[in-house]
């Protein structure tokens, strides 16, 4: 299959005109997590065919005893059945001329048991001979909010510009859910499991040219064709940032990956070398992945790696400086004119007008400092990006006072972000108090709505900024 044909085929997979759910539950409710309920709740506009041997109707839709008895064409069939009958269901799909089968069903080669391996091979044989394309088995399938497709009813219906390709179903659900909470929304997500047919390479090749997608992320345990994967990723990174978690690189992780999705993982050294050559941004976990995605969705590109830091707490400022330097960012001295301006704005006791800047500890005065201080830092030719951190749990007194003062400070940051010539990054340390966590979430959402990137701590922020810059430096070299 040519690259063009492959992309066309994947596009059709994300745009099925009809879906059959084999194993649809007869007792499904609108508010349930059943596959039919999800499609209805998410507003899928195509035809839905519940398949159930005993039910005549499910959620107001006519049910059928088998795929073969559906009167019209079927683009996608979701297998929600015990693995031991999956070969029979695939034979029905083959006879019906189904285009794509999504095997949510698990119990195949990932178990390491002979029965599961043999059955997977048989399902694969039937599908290949009939030309049925397969997602899975052992996977969650598709999440495409714009098209009404989802593998979780509680996930956001709002579309974004980030795509995620995941070998793991749980990782796909967790990433979307956590991303939604952090103001990150998705164009298309696929969980592909054991990948007996379609794998990450197929989906990434399509997403690299997808106009809805600006950033691509992936969780990968292993690949079938390393040469093709490398070529596709190398092409992708010249068009869009590609952030990846490579799992299964330790001895224990390799063993776990083999039992999870039945793949061969490869050594850390091989994958690290590949990521560097191809321009892939490698991360260790879902949290780091979302941190980097946050930068690509919300951060304007700085002209360099020099950071101006503003935050309460001298020790926090020192640690923030160390964190920056450790990941390849710089925290330079301000120009004399900047220094003079900041000294006029900041009182002497318990503060610092040097980089990192520590303004007055009273949060109520921060809005005033931001108004002039950030403008001065913005004009300093020694600085490329400004990072301000607010530790909410160190402020005593009534939570209403904290909220009012923080509201004022964030108001100023939002207004200034549209005036400053350099990117602004906000860190909100929520701390351990339930009250401050609630305030932090509220202010985070205000910042995100205004297009300001927000992080829960300085470490996450500076690592993300550095990786963001590394990708753009890679592009500067290869394009």
Name the predicted role of every residue range.
Residues 1-479:
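Catalytic-core regions of core metabolic enzymes
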């Amino acid at each position: 299959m040519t690259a063009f044909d492959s992309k066309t085929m994947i596009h059709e997979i994300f745009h099925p005109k009809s879906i059959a759910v084999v194993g649809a539950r007869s007792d499904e409710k609108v508010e349930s997590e059943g596959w039919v309920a999800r499609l209805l709740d998410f507003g899928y506009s195509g035809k839905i065919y519940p398949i159930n041997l005993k039910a005549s109707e499910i959620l107001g839709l006519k049910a059928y005893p088998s795929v073969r008895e559906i009167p019209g064409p079927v683009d996608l069939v979701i297998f929600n059945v015990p693995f031991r009958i999956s070969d029979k269901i695939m034979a029905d799909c083959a006879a019906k001329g189904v285009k794509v089968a999504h095997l949510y069903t698990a119990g195949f080669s990932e178990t390491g048991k002979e029965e599961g391996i043999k059955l997977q091979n048989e399902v694969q044989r039937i599908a290949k001979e009939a030309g049925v394309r397969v997602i899975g088995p052992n996977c969650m399938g598709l999440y495409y909010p714009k098209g009404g497709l989802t593998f979780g009813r509680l996930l956001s219906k709002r579309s974004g510009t980030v795509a995620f390709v995941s070998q793991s179903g749980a990782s796909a659900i967790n990433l979307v859910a956590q991303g939604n909470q952090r103001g990150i929304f998705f164009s298309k997500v696929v969980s592909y499991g054991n990948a007996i047919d379609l794998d990450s390479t197929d989906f990434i090749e399509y997403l690299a040219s997808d106009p809805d997608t600006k950033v691509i992320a992936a969780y990968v345990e292993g690949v079938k064709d390393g040469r093709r994967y490398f070529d596709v990723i190398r092409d992708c990174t010249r068009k869009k940032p590609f952030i990846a978690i490579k799992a299964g690189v330790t001895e224990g992780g390799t063993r776990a990956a083999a039992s999870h999705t039945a793949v061969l993982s490869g050594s850390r050294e091989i994958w690290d070398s590949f990521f560097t050559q191809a321009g892939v941004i490698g991360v260790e976990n879902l949290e780091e992945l979302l941190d980097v995605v946050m930068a690509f969705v919300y951060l304007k590109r700085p002209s360099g790696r020099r950071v101006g830091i503003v935050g309460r707490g001298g020790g926090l400022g020192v640690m923030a400086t160390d964190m920056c330097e450790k990941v390849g960012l710089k925290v330079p001295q301000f120009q004399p004119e900047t220094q003079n301006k900041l000294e006029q704005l900041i009182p002497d006791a318990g503060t610092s007008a040097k980089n990192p800047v520590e303004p007055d500890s009273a949060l109520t005065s921060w809005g005033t400092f931001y108004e002039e201080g950030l403008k001065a830092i913005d004009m300093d030719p020694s600085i490329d990006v400004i990072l301000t951190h607010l530790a909410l749990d160190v402020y005593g007194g009534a939570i209403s006072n904290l909220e009012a003062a923080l509201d004022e400070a964030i108001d100023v940051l939002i207004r200034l972000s549209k005036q400053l010539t350099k990117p602004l990054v906000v860190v909100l340390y929520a701390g351990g108090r339930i009250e401050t966590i609630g305030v932090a979430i509220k202010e985070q959402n205000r910042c995100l709505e205004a297009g300001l990137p927000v992080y829960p701590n300085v470490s996450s922020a500076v690592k993300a900024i550095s990786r963001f810059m590394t990708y753009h430096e890679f592009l500067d070299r290869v394009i």
